Amino acid sequence: VKTTTKKSVFIIPSVFKSPGKEGDFGWMIKQEEYKDAFFIFNDNEEQFLAHHNNPEDPKGIGCQPGGGNAVIRPCQCKIPPRAGGIPTGTVSGYKRLDEKTKDLIDKAVSQILKTVIENNYQRIYFSSDSKDGKSLGTGIFKVGEEVKEYIVKKINSMFD
């Protein structure tokens, strides 16, 4: 549990098992019991940048649903935003953690933190490959371990 000076925010790893239950962000985000939650999805670089360069364009590619947990991408374009993407690759996953990749991840996490604080969300869900939350859950892109570890570290240190 990470805390800010104003409130406590729970950062919760979530494992996808099957559609229509916990772990399925597309289902969870529609349930009343998750109305105080913000969801982090794995984004591709092109759509991540499209949204961040023009967040006011609900018809743009940065607001279109994607595969896997990016099905909730349109929720980052709603008011208030209920989701935010962290880029995990371009046409395939980032293989290594270079400065460009770090910068994109840092930009995403900063925006997510700002949105969570501004909208008083109590919980943040991110996709994990296990309940211990040590590694990012990925399905479509094959993302390098150091990249996945960096993303999880940044998510977990948002309120430090």
Model-assigned labels for residue ranges:
Residues K2-D160:
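Macrodomain-like recognition of ADP-ribose-binding/processing modules
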